[in-house]
């Protein structure tokens, strides 16, 4: 079995998978959303303290399975440094105690493998990665090498939802609550936001301007009613999704994708999923979607990504395993 450990942000998660059959032996995640909600976002120091409690508790659940573990896969990049260190420290200690190999997993690569939790990975593949920390269009070639085609210059897709939710006092995280309120909209033409970089040829995303447009409209309201909230959420969500699709259409003209995947916590947005289905049908491209319950951070995807390295014997020494809060991929240049 392969043990997966995830602690890159505010989710503590542990998973066990069979490296031969991909059977999920154990999976559990402890979310910190409730603890961070009162602050309107993730507080790194609090996240670190909560990981120190949650990870040992999760490990305790699988004590009887430790003798059957053949390798440990752990997220070491990118993420919050104080969060990453919790998972990496536990992985190192277990690896030494059990005398089994250690595998370093890039968190973003883990998200890509959320598309293949129950099957073999097949490349080449185009991927849209949308989360609270990242917005990227990636290309993975036949050898599994990753090229970044586009990314955001400021806020991420998911982060913009969190910030709009905070402006409207809807709580944290914002993705689900903004989507739910958007569905209550009765006047779809009331607010019109400009799609960022609409006529800009650069393969780049930017959500800060859209966020400011929302702030301006909110400031014009003397009091904010439920109808106001629903109408604003609808206009914002639609514009944010349109921004994603606008750049994707440009990428599809440059790359003849036959298969395209969508991953990351924000990929659970139903509006975005529907638009991507239309885009892929238009381009005769197979759309791969991560299961809704595994869009957000989880240890299953880390174990799954680690399994690929396990068979290639891409292990890492304890002394060489470090955390890298910020890390990217090779960038595409037009």
Swiss-Prot record:
InterPro entries in the record: ATPase_NBD (IPR043129), Gcp-like_dom (IPR000905), KAE1/TsaD (IPR017861), Peptidase_M22_CS (IPR017860), TsaD (IPR022450)
Disulfide-bonded cysteines: none
UniProt key word Acyltransferase: yes
Principal cellular location given in the protein's record: cytoplasm
Entry EC no(s): 2.3.1.234
GO cellular component: cytoplasm
Residues given in the record as substrate binding sites: 129-133, 162, 175, 269
Cofactor binding mode and count: Binds 1 Fe(2+) ion per subunit.
Top enzyme category: transferase
The keyword Iron is assigned to this record: yes
SUPFAM superfamilies to which the protein is assigned, alphabetical: Actin-like ATPase domain
Catalytic activity: L-threonylcarbamoyladenylate + adenosine(37) in tRNA = N(6)-L-threonylcarbamoyladenosine(37) in tRNA + AMP + H(+)
GO BP annotation list: tRNA threonylcarbamoyladenosine modification
Subcellular location: Cytoplasm
Residues where Fe cation binds: 107, 111, 297
Pfam families the UniProt entry points to: TsaD
Gene Ontology terms, MF aspect: iron ion binding; N(6)-L-threonylcarbamoyladenine synthase activity
PANTHER family in alphabetical order: TRNA N6-ADENOSINE THREONYLCARBAMOYLTRANSFERASE (PTHR11735), TRNA N6-ADENOSINE THREONYLCARBAMOYLTRANSFERASE, MITOCHONDRIAL (PTHR11735:SF6)
Function: Required for the formation of a threonylcarbamoyl group on adenosine at position 37 (t(6)A37) in tRNAs that read codons beginning with adenine. Is involved in the transfer of the threonylcarbamoyl moiety of threonylcarbamoyl-AMP (TC-AMP) to the N6 group of A37, together with TsaE and TsaB. TsaD likely plays a direct catalytic role in this reaction.
Family named by the database record: Belongs to the KAE1 / TsaD family.
Name of the protein in its database record: tRNA N6-adenosine threonylcarbamoyltransferase
Gene from which the chain derives: tsaD
């Amino acid at each position: 079995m392969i043990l997966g450990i995830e602690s890159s942000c505010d989710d503590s998660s542990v998973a066990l998978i069979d490296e031969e059959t991909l059977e999920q032996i154990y999976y559990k995640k402890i979310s910190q959303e409730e603890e961070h909600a009162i602050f309107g976002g993730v507080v790194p120091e609090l996240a670190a303290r909560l990981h120190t409690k949650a990870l040992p508790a999760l490990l305790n659940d699988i004590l009887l399975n430790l003798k059957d573990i053949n390798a440990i896969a752990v997220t070491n990049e990118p993420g919050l440094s104080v969060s990453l260190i919790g998972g990496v420290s536990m992985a190192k200690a277990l690896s030494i105690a059990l005398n089994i190999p250690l595998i370093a997993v890039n968190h973003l690569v883990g998200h890509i493998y959320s598309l293949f939790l129950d099957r073999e990975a097949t490349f080449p593949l185009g991927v849209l990665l949308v989360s609270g920390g990242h917005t990227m269009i990636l290309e993975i070639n036949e050898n599994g090498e990753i090229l970044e085609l586009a990314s955001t210059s400021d806020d991420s897709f998911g982060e913009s939802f969190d910030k709009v939710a905070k402006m409207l006092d809807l709580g944290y995280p914002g993705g689900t609550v903004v989507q739910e309120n958007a569905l209550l909209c009765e006047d779809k033409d009331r607010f019109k936001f400009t799609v960022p970089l609409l006529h800009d040829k650069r393969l780049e995303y930017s959500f800060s301007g859209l966020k400011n447009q929302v702030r301006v409209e909110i400031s014009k309201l003397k009091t904010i009613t439920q109808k106001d909230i629903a109408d604003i959420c609808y206009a914002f969500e639609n514009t944010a999704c349109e921004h994603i699709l606008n750049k994707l259409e440009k990428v599809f003209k440059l790359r003849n994708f036959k298969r395209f995947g969508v991953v990351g916590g924000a990929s659970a947005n139903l509006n975005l999923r529907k638009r991507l289905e239309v885009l892929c049908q238009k381009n005769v491209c197979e759309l791969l979607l991560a299961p809704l319950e595994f869009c957000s951070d989880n240890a299953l995807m880390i174990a799954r990504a680690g399994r690929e390295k396990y068979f290639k014997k891409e292990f890492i020494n304890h002394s060489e395993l470090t955390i890298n809060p910020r890390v990217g991929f090779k960038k595409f240049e037009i």
